[in-house]
Amino acid sequence: MNRFHISGPKNLSGEIKISGSKNAALPILLTSLLISEPIKLKNVPKLTDIMYAIKILTKLGVKIKVEKKVLYIDAKTIAICTIPDYLTKKTRASIWILGPLLARFGQAKISLPGGCKIGKRKIDLHLSGLKKLGANIAIKNNYIIGSVITKLIGNTIVLPIASVGATITIMSAATIATGITIINNAAREPEIIDVANFLNKLGAKIIGAGSKNIFITGVLKLHGGSYTIMPDRIETGTFLVAAAISNGSIICHNTKPNVLINLTKKLCETGAQIKTGTNWISLNMKGIYSKAINIKTAPYPGFPTDMQAIFSLLNLVSHGNSIVTETIFENRFSYVSELKKMGAKAQIKNNSLFCYGVKKLYSATVFASDLRSCASLILAGCIADGTTIVKNIHYIKRGYERFQEKLQSIGAKICN
């Protein structure tokens, strides 16, 4: 059934092992097309978006073996360079296959990508970046059709906005292009560093990932090897907030505290007690009535847009009023009307959410409309009085591995 029945309120406390990062695993998996030798990817989360990416690669002729959290990939031989819409419409990440196909094979035909419906999320920057590397690209009958006469050629590309997706597309395509490519105003997200580390381990020459300027010296080819995907910082943040909203205490293991400073700093401002180690973060909110604080999403190292819906829930059940400003995507407050059904008090004005804290939420039947709103509504159900029904839970499986089981392990009462 595409719904959860959640009984609350429950105190969410315990220990969680964080899974591999969805936002790193997807581009790394798809850029494996650049490599003709066998690859071993470890710590790959079991998610529907990963499954769709595997189906796309398999359709192209890539051989993939799955063993728990490990993928064995052999892209030595590609049968076709065309991806039909029934595959690309399932995940927006499918756009990341365009660069590797053009760089290695000189041709590509993919249907326009799908994914969560959050704002416009244009692909213009991906296409313009590839054009500056020498690709010929046109859109016909809902398909992106690309070709390269000989090889992609390095160039200096200035991104008008620091797009994560476009940075990854250009960086991956440039690894086996001729000459040097410079990406100015590149996105700085940790997942971009992870993609660069993966490519560098297999022979790429990328310098500056994680800064505003990335330099890529094209190499003739990449070689095979093994790589471990970084932990998921958004999953970590989600479970930290889960404990915070329920006056709980949690330890998140197998994570990277240094890439979560933008979030943990804000959690401390709410009153949470945060401790960190080399690969763990703990939060204690027992006996503490959280304070509502203002947040504003921004490209990394700013506050992550993927945490906006989840942190807003904390504001809505905290003491005082606050303003949440969304600067990355349009239409990312779809969850607010659903939380209002549960007793939340909020008002949307343009790209800002005005939160008026309440002490308690109440059960209701609510509908998720994207991945992060689904997580927010599920967490709301965990602390609401009564039994909440969250529908459209298929979204949660796109970005959280074993979310139901992990929540149950820290005290949530959830069933289908």
Curated annotation (Swiss-Prot):
Phosphoenolpyruvate binds at residues 22-23. The modification 2-(S-cysteinyl)pyruvic acid O-phosphothioketal is found at residue 116. It is found in: Cytoplasm. The active site is at residue 116. One of its GO terms (biological process) is peptidoglycan biosynthetic process. GO terms for cellular component: cytoplasm. One of its GO terms (molecular function) is UDP-N-acetylglucosamine 1-carboxyvinyltransferase activity. Its EC number is 2.5.1.7. SUPFAM superfamilies: EPT/RTPC-like. InterPro entries: Enolpyruvate_Tfrase_dom, Enolpyruvate_Tfrase_sf, MurA_subfamily, RNA3'P_cycl/enolpyr_Trfase_a/b, UDP_GlcNAc_COvinyl_MurA. It comes from the Bacteria. It catalyses: phosphoenolpyruvate + UDP-N-acetyl-alpha-D-glucosamine = UDP-N-acetyl-3-O-(1-carboxyvinyl)-alpha-D-glucosamine + phosphate. The keyword Iron does not apply. UDP-N-acetyl-alpha-D-glucosamine binds at residues 92, 306, 328. Pfam families: EPSP_synthase. Pathway: Cell wall biogenesis; peptidoglycan biosynthesis. Keywords: Cell cycle, Cell division, Cell shape, Cell wall biogenesis/degradation, Cytoplasm, Peptidoglycan synthesis, Pyruvate, Transferase. NCBIfam families: murA, PRK09369.1. Cell wall formation. Adds enolpyruvyl to UDP-N-acetylglucosamine. Belongs to the EPSP synthase family. MurA subfamily. This is UDP-N-acetylglucosamine 1-carboxyvinyltransferase. The gene is murA.
